[in-house]
């Protein structure tokens, strides 16, 4: 009699795990990834706001789009990925003549590493669920506001998990 209940329990557990139901360890990993994403976005914001980095001055005039709906779920990170590609394009503009090539390369390498890490974390957080299609608001924001809004998103997600 207990054998049937045990087998039913095992089958249900396997079905939940196979369908991506959150487990305590996956929630812990998600929290770590969201925290890492938050820290990387904050570091990227510091780099963008650095007045010594003249190369980034062009980026401050570029317009970024935010999701039409208030981003509240991990699936909305797909919108961040899409706009991050544009951010990379802006950063690959011609180098400033006021800085020597080594300073530009070092600074841009740091930023590229941060953005690559952000993309990796977002892809890990999304898992196989990357089919979400973003709808963007007609209003645009500048780079600093763009990063601040995604930082706020990560803080909100992290606080709901704790």
Curated annotation (Swiss-Prot):
Glycosylation sites: 23, 70
GTP-binding as UniProt keyword: no
Cited InterPro entries: 4_helix_cytokine-like_core (IPR009079), IL-2 (IPR000779), IL-2_CS (IPR030477)
Compartment(s) where it occurs, according to its Swiss-Prot or TrEMBL record: Secreted
Disulfide bonds: 79-134
GO biological process: adaptive immune response
Classification via Pfam families: IL2
Primary localization class, coarse: secreted
Record carries keyword Secreted: yes
Gene3D superfamilies assigned: 1.20.1250.10
Any one GO CC term of the record: extracellular space
GO molecular function annotation: cytokine activity; growth factor activity; interleukin-2 receptor binding
Endpoints of the signal sequence: 1-20
Keywords: Adaptive immunity, Cytokine, Disulfide bond, Glycoprotein, Growth factor, Immunity, Secreted, Signal
PANTHER family: INTERLEUKIN-2
Function summary: Cytokine produced by activated CD4-positive helper T-cells and to a lesser extend activated CD8-positive T-cells and natural killer (NK) cells that plays pivotal roles in the immune response and tolerance. Binds to a receptor complex composed of either the high-affinity trimeric IL-2R (IL2RA/CD25, IL2RB/CD122 and IL2RG/CD132) or the low-affinity dimeric IL-2R (IL2RB and IL2RG). Interaction with the receptor leads to oligomerization and conformation changes in the IL-2R subunits resulting in downstream signaling starting with phosphorylation of JAK1 and JAK3.
Family: Belongs to the IL-2 family.
Protein name: Interleukin-2
Species annotation: Cervus elaphus (Red deer)
């Amino acid at each position: 009699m207990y054998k049937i209940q045990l087998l039913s329990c095992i089958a249900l557990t396997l079905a939940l795990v196979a369908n991506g139901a959150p487990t305590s360890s996956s929630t812990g990993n998600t929290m770590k990834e969201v925290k890492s994403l938050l820290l990387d976005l904050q570091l990227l914001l510091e780099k963008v706001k650095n007045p010594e980095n003249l190369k980034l001055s062009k980026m401050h005039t570029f317009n970024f789009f935010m999701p039409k709906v208030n981003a509240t779920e991990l699936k909305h990170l797909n919108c961040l990925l899409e706009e991050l590609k544009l951010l990379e394009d802006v950063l690959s503009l011609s180098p400033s003549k006021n800085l020597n090539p080594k300073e530009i390369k070092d600074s841009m390498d740091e930023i590229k590493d941060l953005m690559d890490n952000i993309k990796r974390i977002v892809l890990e957080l999304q898992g196989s669920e990357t089919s979400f299609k973003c709808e963007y608001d007609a209003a645009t924001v500048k780079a600093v506001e763009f990063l601040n809004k995604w930082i706020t998103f990560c803080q909100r997600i992290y606080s709901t998990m704790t």
